[in-house]
Amino acid sequence: MPFITSVYAREVLDSRGNPTVEVEIVTDSGAFGRTLVPSGASTGEHEAVELRDGDKSRYLGKGVLKAVENVNDIIGPAILGDSVLDQVALDRKLIALDGTKNKGKLGANAILGVSIAAAKAAADLLNLELYQYLGGFNAKQLPVPMMNIINGGAHSDAPIDFQEFMIFPVGAPSFKEAIRWGAEIFHALKAILKKKGLSTAVGDEGGFAPNLASNEDTIDNILEAIKNAGYKAGEEVFIGFDVAASEFFDKAKGKYVFKKSTKEEFTSAELVEYYAGLVQKYPIISIEDGMDENDWDGWKLLTDKLGSKIQLVGDDLFVTNTEYLARGIKTNTANSILVKVNQIGTLTETFDAIEMAKRAGYTAVISHRSGETEDTTIADIAVAANTGQIKTGSASRTDRVAKYNQLMRIEDQLGEDAVYLGKDSFYNLKK
């Protein structure tokens, strides 16, 4: 039977050694679901609230015992006897229990853990894989991996202002081959950095964090790696960035400042022209968070300039929230949304954002967080929702590779039904 008989949360660790919430749900038939909740480093100010204890004597104030307590003492008792097969009703109940717009009372980390664990228990009950339960028989598109091979910005100590430099193996014939291409380019880049006497230590998301001179220097090294690995940049493999511009926007000056490298300052219009120059010079297919999350005028300038040429992904801008996404659609701002389950806090709201994006011709990119775990839920969500793109780090660190391995399992299970669309996944770009 599908009725919840047990809900239990505990405090565990994420990939950065910080506490996070793990939730387990059991039904009366013994069906079981467990999930671990991720955590971000660069967070949008409009995100749902990740509840931390603030007790400096434990984990530097980052403990999550309060969120765990909220699951065990408030949420759990409230949903005992409820069906795991009615995800929408369950998520609505969780939202109502919290009663705040940003889930600040119980914590999005508490609510999300319960939401996903319930879905996993439902899948277990029906003897289905999670992607099959969430997406039905039409869940068959494998996503293009946006592999983050160099980390800068808030994700590393390297003197590079852009937060992530990614490769997109769009020319691969399958997901499995796309991962092979990405891994080979990753190793080619490692060899280049080693030869130049640069660090091959990796950042939070598994990409290298070398002491390169600038954003352009970083791009040049990546293009060299693509070539050395035997692939053609601009045909088989493209590049992209998560700029995370909110991290270097100086509110006092009202300007964007490359604080970590050249110290250059830009107005919104000047930064748009800077990006346009990069797009003209390099095989770029995607830019994420090119403007500050509150700089809607700057975002509009960026979209008008480059929106028909490349993917412009809103992460901090939209925070997986249909309210902000609706504003973007109405004003024709950006053309893609980054989807992070813990930015909004329930599976239902996550799928609502994905569907709204698709209806408007925006792509939806399923994403990890910098503080990850061995949990592979986002891999299943990417296939369940046929999003066509996933951003889950580099070809190193088990917390990142776990998602790629799960996607390769799914592709194997799907067999000849599996679809990898490559560049056609970017349906937001005008042909």
Curated annotation (Swiss-Prot):
The keyword Magnesium applies. GO terms for biological process: glycolytic process. Keywords: Cytoplasm, Glycolysis, Lyase, Magnesium, Metal-binding, Secreted. One of its GO terms (molecular function) is phosphopyruvate hydratase activity. Its EC number is 4.2.1.11. It catalyses: (2R)-2-phosphoglycerate = phosphoenolpyruvate + H2O. The keyword Cytoplasm applies. (2R)-2-phosphoglycerate binds at Q163, K340, R369, S370, K391. Binds a second Mg(2+) ion via substrate during catalysis. GO terms for cellular component: cell surface; extracellular region; phosphopyruvate hydratase complex. Its cofactor is Mg(2+). Pathway: Carbohydrate degradation; glycolysis; pyruvate from D-glyceraldehyde 3-phosphate: step 4/5. It is found in: Cytoplasm; Secreted; Cell surface. Signal peptide: none annotated. InterPro entries: Enolase (IPR000941), Enolase-like_C_sf (IPR036849), Enolase-like_N (IPR029017), Enolase_C (IPR020810), Enolase_CS (IPR020809), Enolase_N (IPR020811). Catalyzes the reversible conversion of 2-phosphoglycerate (2-PG) into phosphoenolpyruvate (PEP). It is essential for the degradation of carbohydrates via glycolysis. Belongs to the enolase family. This is Enolase. It comes from Acholeplasma laidlawii (strain PG-8A). The lineage of its organism: Bacteria, Bacillati, Mycoplasmatota, Mollicutes, Acholeplasmatales. The gene is eno.
